[in-house]
């Protein structure tokens, strides 16, 4: 089972990279002035996918100064929905592994999942819109077999307004270029510290 999961994961990674390569080619041929937005979508996706500790907030703030905040928010929402579709599929495979099922069948997990199932859509929207960690709710969605369509819809409903607020804030405050670099480093340091703190706490 483990080897088959790895093979599927690599196929998903290839689909992920290929989709953005195709988008880059299409935009380059027909609307080259929006080429950097493809990279924005790519960055937004990997910060919710294979490199989750990458901060997306400074990038959304920056792009709010370069393009219409509504456009930035909409594309950010679409990119996040695309990557969450892939996340859902990967987690569906991982949670079928026997070692993982020993965790998801524990009493504490089933109790937490039960609370999630009382209001899954609202839970996903609130965690996606606010600083509340989204990852546990993503896992609950998969293990509780929550509708993929509703899951993706909740992601769009939650993330798009969040991106719009950030992009609009960026358009209003208009920091110097180095300001976004400092913000990026601050958010990155916080994310890495949190991950290390959790790892040491578990150890």
Regions found by a protein language model. Give the residues of each.
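Membrane-interfacial helix-loop-helix
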Residues: 1-39, 66-135, 143-150, 171-203
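Transmembrane alpha-helix boundary and packing residues in multipass membrane permease domains
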Residues: 61, 88, 92, 139, ...
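Short alpha-helical segments used as structural interaction elements across diverse proteins
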Residues: 45, 135, 156-159, 192
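Hydrophobic, membrane-inserted alpha-helices
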Residues: 20, 57-60, 162-169
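Transmembrane helix boundary and interhelical junction motifs in multipass membrane proteins
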Residues: 40-62, 129-139
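Hydrophobic alpha-helical transmembrane bundles that constitute the permease/transmembrane domains
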Residues: 81, 132-133, 156-164
């Amino acid at each position: 089972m483990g080897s088959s999961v790895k093979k599927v994961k690599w196929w998903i990674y290839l689909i992920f990279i290929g989709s953005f390569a195709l988008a880059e080619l299409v935009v380059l041929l027909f609307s080259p002035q929006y080429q950097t937005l493809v990279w924005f979508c790519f960055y937004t996706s990997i910060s919710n996918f294979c490199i989750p500790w990458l901060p997306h907030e400074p990038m959304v703030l920056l792009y709010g100064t370069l393009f219409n905040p509504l456009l930035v928010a909409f594309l950010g929402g679409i990119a996040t929905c695309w990557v969450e579709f892939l996340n859902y599929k990967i987690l569906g495979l991982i949670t079928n592994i026997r070692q993982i099922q020993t965790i998801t069948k524990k009493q504490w997990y089933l109790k937490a999942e039960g609370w999630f199932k009382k209001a899954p859509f609202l839970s996903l929207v609130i965690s996606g819109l606010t600083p509340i960690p989204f990852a546990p709710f993503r896992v609950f969605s998969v293990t509780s077999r929550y509708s993929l369509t509703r899951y993706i819809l909740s992601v769009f409903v939650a993330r798009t307004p969040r991106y719009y607020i950030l992009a609009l804030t960026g358009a209003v405050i208009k920091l110097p270029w180095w300001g976004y670099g400092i913000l990026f480093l601050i958010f990155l340091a916080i994310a890495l510290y949190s991950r290390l703190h959790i790892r040491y706490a578990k150890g």
